[in-house]
Amino acid sequence: MAEECLARKFNLSDNYCPAYFDGLLCWDPTPWNTLAVQKCFKELYGIQYDDTQNASRLCLDGVWHNYTNYTNCTERIANGSPTDVASLIYLAGYSLSLAVLSLAVFVFLYFKDLRCLRNTIHTNLMSTYILSACSWILNLVLQNWSDESQQDQTSCMILVICMNYFYLTNFFWMLVEGLYLYMLVVETFTAENIKLKVYTTIGWGAPAVFITIWVISRCFVNVLPSTGPDGLAMFPEAKMCIWMHEHQVDWIHKAPALVGLALNLFFLIRIMWVLITKLRSANTLETEQYRKATKALLVLIPLLGITNLLVLCGPSDDSWFAYAFDYTRALMLSTQGFTVALFYCFMNTEVRHAIRYHVERWKTGRTIGGGRRRGASYSKDWSPRSRTESIRLTV
């Protein structure tokens, strides 16, 4: 584009500033002592700008002034816009999920009865939801309550890196959940061969590798120019956090997340096939078989992250359907952690029994004043883990 701009040579006298490209817009030859004005750009790095406003550059005695005035080229976000409404939905959903997930993680960590490989995987997945929600809320706060012109690039870089890492760990722990269930239900003879260390390496280690590669690549790309060809500031928003602007190298961490979702979709199909086959072989009514299969499907969808596939692509126009899709996506994605905590902790029979047992033991201790404890059906550290029960409690 710069070459095309500079090639604009008309039959002009010497009393003109030559064609000039400042890195964003092309300025045609302009008479001396004239303020050149043209429309702002519509979009820059995925961000929509108000193109009804103007940018300007001054031509003085045959030489362009060393600064282009882009002050009026502001981001197009109207008050009460669908983007604002969707952000509020995200904020409410993430806040709710954060509170419920924190309580669920506390339950799994506090009660030793619940400690097993399956619940440890659940705890790690819920932890990634918590970290992702915290980073999203922090990012929202910084974007709306901080002065963008004074944003510290180092702090912003750390926040964006952490946010992308937590998001990616979330997808990889979903993959771990899918792999664990697949090995448990489909590959029943090899399920015990995969230890917690392997799952931990997949869930926390693999995302670290992709994020490291992404950070190194991102450091070498020019995302948002802060100076023009003359070396002087040309765009006020160049002081914004450049790490928040999308770039093609972002696919380094986006692609693994999509691959993980695709694998989980495969795991879900195989698991449902095995479950439906077992239900058909059992002596149960057909309606009962459909009910159990539907229940298993609805419970597994949020655990394996299939919700993300349902709202992966949508309309981008200004129709009512596009607005409804944005709101639905915001609601489903922000409350996904809440759904996982609800299904796999608070509605889990094993968890409810463990909580009830400890509450009763606490009441008994207070009643007898620290005397002899009532006999219990199982101790605090005891937890039955047969394969059949594990499948039942998981699905």
Swiss-Prot record:
Membrane topology (UniProt): Multi-pass membrane protein
Domain of life: Eukaryota
Molecular function GO labels: diuretic hormone receptor activity; G protein-coupled peptide receptor activity; peptide hormone binding
Stated role: Receptor for the insect diurectic hormone. The activity of this receptor is mediated by G proteins which activate adenylyl cyclase.
CDD domains according to UniProt: 7tmB1_DH_R (cd15263)
Compositionally biased spans, kind Basic and acidic residues: 382-395
Pfam families: 7tm_2, HRM
Entry-listed glycosylation sites: 11, 54, 66, 69, 72, 144
Expressing tissues: Expressed in Malpighian tubules.
Keyword Glycoprotein in record: yes
Protein name: Diuretic hormone receptor
Membrane topology (Extracellular): 1-87, 141-155, 218-248, 315-329
GO biological process: adenylate cyclase-modulating G protein-coupled receptor signaling pathway; cell surface receptor signaling pathway
Location of this chain's protein in the cell: Cell membrane
Family: Belongs to the G-protein coupled receptor 2 family.
Ranges where the record places region Disordered: 369-395
Membrane side Cytoplasmic: residue ranges: 112-119, 177-195, 273-295, 350-395
Alphabetical list of InterPro entries matching this protein: GPCR_2 (IPR050332), GPCR_2-like_7TM (IPR017981), GPCR_2_diuretic_rcpt (IPR002001), GPCR_2_extracell_dom_sf (IPR036445), GPCR_2_extracellular_dom (IPR001879), GPCR_2_secretin-like (IPR000832), GPCR_2_secretin-like_CS (IPR017983)
Keywords from the UniProt entry: Cell membrane, G-protein coupled receptor, Glycoprotein, Membrane, Receptor, Transducer, Transmembrane, Transmembrane helix
GO cellular component labels: plasma membrane
